[in-house]
Amino acid sequence: MSTGWHAELELRFEHNREVTRLMRRRHVGPLAVQQPFYPEKDGSAHVYLLHPPGGVAGDDVLDISCFLGRGARAVLTTPGATKFYRSERGQSTQTTRIDVGEGGICEYLPQETIVFDGAKASIGTKVFLSGDAVYLGWDIISLGRPACQESFDTGEVRQRIEIFRDGKPIWFEQFRLHGADPALNAAFAFCAKPIVATMVYAGPADESALHAIREAVGDAARNLFSVSRLERVIVCRYLGGRMSEAKTLFRKAWEVLRETGLGKPAAAPRIWAT
C-alpha cells in the first residue's frame, strides 16, 4: 500500500483582451500556484508552480496539468529546485502534461531537479501542440549532489520527454539509469558528469537560430553544450559538472530563441533573481 503523497495541480489559461488569464486552478495535496505576474507587454502570464514540501520521497506522485487555450501565452517556472530524496520505499514520480492551443506559447522553465543518491525517481513531460502552437522547455537534472561530493551510486532515475503536434509525435526521448550503470562513467555516454540537461524548442526557427545560439554560448562551452535541429524542433544539451554553468548556458540559448523564434526580448521570471 502506498504511503506517499499524491498531489495534483490543474491549470487552465485563456487569452482574454490582450492578456493571458488563469481561468481555472485545481489542486489536491501539496501543489499550488501563485497569482500570475505580467511583466511583458504582450500579456504573457508568468506563473510560479509551488510544492511547499520542497522534496519528493518514496511513493510520492506529483501530477501537473496545464492547458493553454487559443492564443494564450504563459511562462511556467518554480521558485527552487525539485529534490528526489533517498528512499527505501517505492518510486517517486513527477509527471507534467501541457496542452497548447493554436497560436499559443508555453515556456516551461523549472529550476533544476536534484536526484539524491539512493532515490528512485521518474520524471516525465508530455506536450500536445495544436496548429502553430509553440513550446519551449527544459529539464536540468543533477545526478547526486556534486556540491556535497555525493555521487549517484545507488537508486534509479527515469526521464521521458514526448512532444506531439496535431496528434503526431515530433519529439521523443528517454533514459533510464541505475546507480551502478556503466553508462554513468562511459566516454560514449555520461563521462562521469553529474549534470544532464535538455532544452527543446518546437516552433518557428531556421539555421540562423542555431548559429546565434552557438555565438551566444561561446567557444568555451563547446565541449559541454550542443545545439541541433530536426525539422521544426531545436534541441540544446548540456553535460557537465556545474549547475550554475548549465543554467547560464541554457538561459543564453533561451534568450536567443525568444528573440529569433518568438520575436520578443527575454523577460526572466523575477524569482530567478532571488
Curated annotation (Swiss-Prot):
Gene Ontology MF, one: nickel cation binding
Pfam families assigned: UreD
Location in or out of the cell: Cytoplasm
InterPro entries: UreD
UniProtKB keywords: Chaperone, Cytoplasm, Nickel insertion
GO cellular component: cytoplasm
Annotated function: Required for maturation of urease via the functional incorporation of the urease nickel metallocenter.
Subunit-level organization: UreD, UreF and UreG form a complex that acts as a GTP-hydrolysis-dependent molecular chaperone, activating the urease apoprotein by helping to assemble the nickel containing metallocenter of UreC. The UreE protein probably delivers the nickel.
Family, as annotated: Belongs to the UreD family.
Protein name as it appears in the record: Urease accessory protein UreD 2
